[in-house]
Design a protein with these regions (language model features):
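Pentatricopeptide repeat
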Residues: 4-9, 13, 24, 39-44, ...
Length: 234
């Protein structure tokens, strides 16, 4: 029995998650020979795979191939490309593609908004990041843990500790399940502001919430002590 497109998509997705790129490409190239024509989902998985590898040239080549085959990219496709551009520091291209997506009548998802907000913060464009966050809410999207983490990180890196803590408290009030990244991000902000004691208070709170510190947690605290010149405590 021949494998159908759905089966191939599942296989490609599984291989991609394991980082087996050569096998992903081999399966993709085999599909037409086996009578399984790649679908929009197939192309989106492939594009996402290449973007995560930093191979934007191949990702956009597949995007163009899709269009030539009259397969219309969907929100998942755009999300992969925008995230890929953002991760590779190509924020202007990411914003242009976002605008192109809107002009074509596609509605962005929360992943796209969060990715762009993260990119804007990393550019140092805090005002634009908050403006996009407001737009996200107006479009009916609720901030999830990932979005909050991005804002806390962006504010913390800009020295806006009080604002970052306010968002942290807001997450508590909304009953969101804070994760290790949430705590690590705020700890990093406190350590950067030379407030290691506050970072350790967060460590205690983190463990009371049933979250175990990870390598990133300890690296953050050690770096905090080193920055203070307290090498003996580190």
């Amino acid at each position: 029995m021949k494998a159908n497109v759905v089966t191939y998509n599942a296989l490609i997705n599984g291989l991609s998650k394991k980082g087996q790129i050569d096998e992903v490409v081999e399966v993709f190239n085999t599909m037409p020979k086996m009578g399984a024509i790649p679908s929009i989902v197939t192309y989106s998985i492939m594009i996402d795979t290449y973007c995560k590898q930093g191979n934007l040239q191949q990702a956009f080549a597949l995007h163009n191939e899709m269009i030539q085959k009259q397969l219309i990219p969907n929100v998942v496709t755009f999300s992969a490309l925008i995230n890929g551009l953002r991760k590779n520091g190509k924020m202007q291209e990411a914003k242009d593609l976002f605008q192109n997506m809107l002009e074509k009548g596609f509605f962005p998802n929360s992943i796209i908004y969060t990715s762009l907000i993260d990119g804007l913060f990393k550019q140092g464009n805090m005002i634009a990041a908050f403006k996009l966050g407001e737009e996200m809410i107006k479009k009916g999207f609720m901030f999830d843990v990932v979005t909050y983490n991005v804002f806390i990180n962006g504010l913390g890196n800009r020295g806006k500790i009080n604002e970052a803590k306010e968002l942290f408290s807001e997450m508590h009030q909304k009953g969101l399940a804070l994760d290790c990244i949430t705590f690590n991000t705020l700890m990093h902000a406190y350590c950067k502001a030379s407030n290691v004691n506050k970072a350790f208070e967060l460590l205690d709170e983190m463990m009371r919430n049933g979250l175990m510190p990870n390598v990133a947690t300890y690296n953050t605290l050690i770096a905090g002590y080193c920055n203070l010149g307290s090498m003996d405590k580190a």
